[in-house]
Amino acid sequence: MKTSSAKAKGRNLQKWVVSQLVEHLGANPEDIESRPMGSSGEDVIMGVQTRELFPYSVECKNQEKVNVWAAYEQSTANCGKYEPMVVIKKNHKKPLVVVDAEY
């Protein structure tokens, strides 16, 4: 797969997560956005209002073979004071969410 195609898959998942937060939490669309591909940090950028509704740091992985533990470690490294969360997806499957079971 081309790098541009892989980035497009990741970007689409990030946008899907943003749309779900807007739809289900009532988050203001201007207070939440998908991070540009290739940028460091969490994949979904949230403002103060959205953080109050959803105190998670989101890492998105849209890959056929995901190392869940490595993805969770990446989310943990980027989470700051928020709870790390990984959204994983593969072709033709629904997205799943990984969070610490003891949170």
Model-found features: residue ranges?
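Catalytic phosphate/metal-binding cores of nucleic-acid and nucleotide-processing enzymes, i.e., regions
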Residues: 1-103
